[in-house]
From Swiss-Prot:
Residues 1-11, 69-91, 155-185, 250-251, 336-347, 435-445, 493-514 are cytoplasmic. The gene is caiT. The keyword Transport applies. It is a multi-pass membrane protein. Changing M331V: 10-fold decrease in Vmax. It comes from Proteus mirabilis (strain HI4320). This is L-carnitine/gamma-butyrobetaine antiporter.
Length: 514
């Protein structure tokens, strides 16, 4: 075996432990679901109620850091010596497609119902103030604030990979300027990487858990095929197969094509909902919600409700911030990989403006449509959820539109492709992170990429078959706590190294390889 091939091989200490840990967690969870639910819910309650303030301050501080990057002395620094690998349009499309999935369509269609039925700030459910703040909170949770945290970390990873010419692309390797090479190559670095990989694998399982029943309900609506475990397994297997085909063509071809198709189809479906779902109301509702967001944003940023104890910030804001934290490193590594040649300012502005526009578009159109269906008594969403579950309620919000069969076909295809692009990005990053070394411009071995997608698919099928996905989904949020600290360390390491290297290229001018 050649030296290069050997360097591209699997790193056992970060490849096998996550698989073993995930297997043990699955076994412990499904061994006694009732007991597991009690333990996991208790942990979730403890994290969100006792440490919720930490997630809120994290988001605020990272948002301030984004302004520092955009307007500071590093704004014009280029992340790599070559021209951008992708056109600006394809670059934004790839970011949008890889950072969203059927989970976005899931929450975009139903989230507003939860906000208006159990609103924050002591408001009465289904009241006018509750409906006014409903979309505003969605714009808050899926707006500039979280995307800014991703752009900061993306700059950090792009800096270490393309400017500092690092051969390893996983979280621990970026911490050399902060903790030293000895600790990075020792137990500390191994623990950091394994925390990251375990959280990523479980997060992908959660995404499959949201997407699979949504697609299954589409199939039941279109073909009358009942929801079974066999159908779940077939759907996940198809996703894994399509992902294997995509990665076989490499990052440039496979991901770009899937991302472009997903993005164009998203705009097509959203345009249809916008036109037939009441364009005038949706635009007016969005405009009013932006004003509501600006009015309430200071309180939203720091809302923990310790006096009223209504539970809204714990159930939603802290939950979403923890969700963003879990995906931050994984997505930032991928976003850094496709942002080679961009300036710091270009990456920060491109991510926040482009991705915020995309998520705001989705939540405004889908949320506005759902609100109208509730107001006009076309759908009884609480009854649908009680009798059939949340996925059926979401399907009915789409089926209520004109040309329901054609609409459902479009929604089915969109959910399917959206999840393929997410799995594609995740499996690619998993492969990069579990190889011994990655040189600039190189891609992880094909078999490793396909192998990760297959293994994650198997985990998803097992979780669905055993019925243990729901407690695992809750455990992911609590499990995001270690990544909270890892994200902070990566950020501090970047700031420390850039302060020296981008000033006079000394003393860290030597190539950092681990």
């Amino acid at each position: 075996m050649s030296k290069d091939n050997k360097k591209a091989g699997i790193e056992p200490k970060v490849f096998f432990p996550p698989l073993i840990i995930v297997g043990i967690l699955c076994w412990l969870t499904v061994r006694d679901l009732d007991a597991s639910n009690e333990v996991i819910n208790a942990v979730f309650s403890y994290v969100t109620n006792v440490w919720g303030w930490a997630f809120e301050w994290y988001m605020v501080i990272m948002f301030g850091g984004w302004f520092w990057l955009v307007f500071g002395r590093y704004a014009k620094k280029r992340l790599g010596d070559e021209k951008p690998e992708f056109s600006t349009a394809s670059w934004i499309f790839m970011m949008f497609a890889s950072c969203t999935s059927a989970a976005v369509l899931f929450w975009g269609s139903i989230e507003i119902y939860y906000y208006i039925s159990s609103p924050p700030f002591g408001m009465e459910g289904y009241s006018a103030p509750a409906k006014e703040i409903g979309l505003a909170y969605s714009l808050f949770h899926w707006g500039p604030l979280p995307w800014a945290t991703y752009s900061f970390l993306s700059v950090a990873f792009a800096y270490f990979f393309f400017v500092r010419k690092m051969e390893v692309i996983r979280p621990s390797s970026t911490l050399t300027p902060l903790v030293g090479e000895k600790h990075v190559n020792g137990l500390f670095g191994t623990v950091v990487d394994n925390f990251y990989l375990v959280a990523l694998i479980l997060a992908m399982g959660t995404s499959l858990g949201l997407a699979t029943p949504l697609v299954t309900e589409c199939i039941q609506y279109l073909f009358g095929i009942p929801h079974t475990l066999q159908l779940d397994a077939i759907i996940i297997s198809c996703w894994i197969l399509l992902n294997a085909i995509c990665v076989a063509f490499g990052l440039q071809k496979g991901v770009k094509i899937a991302s472009d198709v997903r993005t164009y189809l998203s705009f097509l479906m959203l345009g249809w909902v916008f036109i037939v779902g009441g364009a005038s109301f949706i635009v007016n509702y969005f405009t009013d919600s932006v004003g509501t967001l600006l009015m309430y944003m200071p309180r939203m940023l720091f809302y923990t409700d310790p006096i009223g104890k209504g539970g809204f910030p714990q159930a939603w804001t802290v939950f979403y911030w923890a969700w963003w934290v879990i995906y931050a490193i994984q997505m930032s590594i991928f976003l850094a990989r496709i942002s080679k040649g961009r300036t710091v300012r270009e990456l920060c502005l491109g991510m926040v403006s482009g991705l915020t526009a995309g998520t705001w578009l989705i939540w405004t159109i889908l949320g506005g449509n759902t609100l109208q269906l509730i107001d006009q008594n076309i759908l009884n969403i609480p009854q649908l959820i009680d009798q059939y579950g949340v996925p059926r309620a979401i399907i009915e919000t789409w089926a209520a539109l004109p040309l329901s069969t054609a609409t459902m076909w479009g929604f089915f295809i969109l959910c399917f492709i959206a999840t393929v692009t997410l799995i594609n990005a995740c499996s690619y990053t998993l492969a990069m992170s579990t190889c011994r070394s990655m040189k600039e411009g190189a891609e992880p071995p094909l078999l490793v990429r396909i192998g990760w997608s297959v293994l994650v698919g198997i985990i998803g099928i097992i979780l669905l078959a055993l019925g243990g996905l729901k407690p695992i989904q809750t455990a992911i949020i609590a499990g995001g706590c270690p990544l909270f600290f890892v994200n902070i360390m990566v950020t501090l390491s970047f700031i420390k190294d850039a302060k020296v290297h981008w000033k006079d290229c000394s003393p860290y001018t030597q190539k950092m390889t681990h």
